[in-house]
């Protein structure tokens, strides 16, 4: 039985993000690192999240927070909005939205972020992310399918 990758690629997990999470392969693009990090949140893989953070971020100090977030957060869907090159070939940005269920409040929430990635020695790393300019929502049409994967229209679900 095959399992679709949680990153939303439509590809089997074993052929998509699983090799990254097992450190069998390294992400060749910022977008593939972004998708694999999302899958790591879904699959509760703190080790991968920590090692895919830029070394200067010292992500190991956040391990407990990351692991506790697994208990109260159920990730429902990812929508990659744009991917763009940075100032050089070793910098890139990925804008995305992701829907999750906060188990404490039982509310669906939508995160919207523009993440920055840096490449060092042919390996991509997540360095930081910012919320896009206030008032600008992700480019999801109100009648588009919700990125959470519910099958409902965005306006009837997370929008």
From Swiss-Prot:
InterPro entries in UniProt: NTF2-like_dom_sf, SEC_C_motif, UPF0225, YchJ-like_M
A Pfam family it matches: SEC-C
Family: Belongs to the UPF0225 family.
NCBIfam families per record: PRK01617.1 (NF002449), PRK01752.1 (NF002486)
Protein name: UPF0225 protein plu2503
Provenance organism: Photorhabdus laumondii subsp. laumondii (strain DSM 15139 / CIP 105565 / TT01)
């Amino acid at each position: 039985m095959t399992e679709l990758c949680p990153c939303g690629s439509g590809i089997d997990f074993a052929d998509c993000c699983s090799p990254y999470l097992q450190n069998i392969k390294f992400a060749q693009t910022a977008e593939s690192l972004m998708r694999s990090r999302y899958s790591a949140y879904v699959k509760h893989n703190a080790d991968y999240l920590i090692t895919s953070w830029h070394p200067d971020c010292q992500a190991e100090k956040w391990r407990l927070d990351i692991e506790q977030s697994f208990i109260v957060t159920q990730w429902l869907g990812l929508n990659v909005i744009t991917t763009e090159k940075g100032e050089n070939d070793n910098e890139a940005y990925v804008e995305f939205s992701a829907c999750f269920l906060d188990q404490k409040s039982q509310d669906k929430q939508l995160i919207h972020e523009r993440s920055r990635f840096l490449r060092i020695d042919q390996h991509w790393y997540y360095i930081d992310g910012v919320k896009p300019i206030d008032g600008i929502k992700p480019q999801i049409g109100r009648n588009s399918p919700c990125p959470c994967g519910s099958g409902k229209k965005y306006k009837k679900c997370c929008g």
